[in-house]
Amino acid sequence: MTRLTREHYAKLYGPTTGDRIRLADTDLIIEITEDRCGGPGLAGEEAVFGGGKVLRESMGQSRLTRAGGAPDTVITGAIIIDHWGIIKADIGIRDGRIVGIGKAGNPDIMDGVDPALIVGPSTEIIAGNNRIVTAGGIDCHVHFICPQILPEALSGGITTMIGGGTGPAEGSKATTVTPGAWHLGRMLQALDGWPMNILMLGKGNTVNPDAMWEQLRGGAAGFKLHEDWGTTPAVIDACLRVADEADVQVALHSDTLNETGFVEGTLAAIGGRAIHAYHTEGAGGGHAPDIITVASHPNVMPSSTNPTRPHTVNTLDEHLDMLMVCHHLNAAVPEDLAFAESRIRPSTIAAEDLLHDIGAISMIGSDSQAMGRIGEVVMRTWQTAHVMKKRRGALPGDPSGPNGNDNNRVRRYVAKYTICPAITHGIDHEIGSVEVGKLADLVLWEPAFFGVRPHAVIKGGGIVWAAMGDANASIPTPQPVFPRPMFSAMHAVAAGLAVHFVSPTAIEDDLAARLALRRRLVPTRDVRNRGKADLPLNDAMPDIRVDPDTFTVRIDGEVWEEHPAAELPMAQRYFLF
């Protein structure tokens, strides 16, 4: 019997069970734990497209029609990285949703073919062999300041945006809020034709429930509480009362100046109710110096943003000027300068690294154009994971040594921008993971460019963005290769591939007809009974204490020392600037 070496097999079909892959130029190594489409026990039955290969008529391609159940698209031999595992499989897509994760082909002549993955004449093939697939990224902290953020986000592997704004208005530059039904309607209409899922946050800074309900009817799928609009205990309580009744989430940016109380008062106002805590580290805002302690509480689902990810020798110098611009502060006013300086604490930024690594801070967003960079959510997540491996070694459960892997750490970090924000905002029934039944929002990566530049971005089953060479060349690959929009990104098509997430109230009020929206509106679901324990691999609740004088952070009694990174992967090897 002819046998293939692992090296030869990987060149033909991609790596298989037991093979290890480095992610970009990081020290992170994944190991495939299962191969559902080939490898040991299934070798020789792989579904591969191309001249002289398997997926041809009466061979790997069956006679099954689309009406008979054939998928629209199959991604062959993909290495799936998700919170639930790291495996290799064929992925089937039909009507914009994932219908199968297993083995594709023709059951008439091939063993073990998943009934949902029978390739027919109506099936398109995307070669996932030697490529990694992740769920489309969810940026849970977006300032909608300019429309140019959308292509930047897609180019970074983001397919869902959660946040608020109306454009380059001062309120939007600072606060992730789309205030009022009129602005909400205009933003939903403006974004209707983009291949990007959208969840808008209305302004929750009011004690008038009617003002919040009209925003829910107008398209808000949650509320933002921001200190620049006045986040008092009364406002927090009033907003959460409406959120509980409407089943939507509240994102909290608390009171840096401690004008209306301290972190203990904010927690008392929250009263054990579910809440998404923005800027948990405090550099972007929130009670100084100890907002970071909210990551210890079971009802608080904490996130931080990418400008402080990871802590480097340049982080502090960059932040002061950014903060002055973002929050409309005046350097000539001593109080404004003191306000800015109170946020930028190296000890809490350093502790943010560790809290992400142990799963105590659960999510990472961008804070786009308001201190953060929308195209770097994915990249900075993996830079943080790399830095933490260098400093702390293998996580519990990850084998160390020359034959070890980082599967547990990788699964934890990918969850921070996929399933965890989806659960937090009640949209995990549609997106957030590579699972059957969910929207086919998927990102393909070459391993050498993982987290840096996607090979292709699939939105609702259509390729909307991809690395593409010169359009006047004889083949698709000649330089310059740029991330470019594809046919499915054209507005008439894109509206059918993406969704607006709204409150159940908006659905009942027939918002789609009132605004003449083309895309599907999807209500949030099961939001208010969620807590930190529901966030996969990111549910740790350590004891966190901050010294009010020195800002020293103790996590479970241990001081976390500051060691800012001087060099990062996924940086100058890939970028000119």
Swiss-Prot record:
List of catalytic residues: H327
InterPro entries reported for this sequence: Amidohydro-rel, Metal-dep_hydrolase_composite, Metal_Hydrolase, Urease_alpha_N_dom, Urease_alpha_subunit, Urease_AS, Urease_asu, Urease_asu_c
Modified residues (N6-carboxylysine): K224
UniProt modification remark: Carboxylation allows a single lysine to coordinate two nickel ions.
Principal localisation: cytoplasm
The reaction(s) this protein catalyses: urea + 2 H2O + H(+) = hydrogencarbonate + 2 NH4(+)
Domain Urease: 136-577
Gene that produces this protein: ureC
Source organism of the structure: Mycobacteroides abscessus (strain ATCC 19977 / DSM 44196 / CCUG 20993 / CIP 104536 / JCM 13569 / NCTC 13031 / TMC 1543 / L948)
Family according to the record: Belongs to the metallo-dependent hydrolases superfamily. Urease alpha subunit family.
Record protein name field: Urease subunit alpha
Pfam families xrefs: Amidohydro_1 (PF01979), Urease_alpha (PF00449)
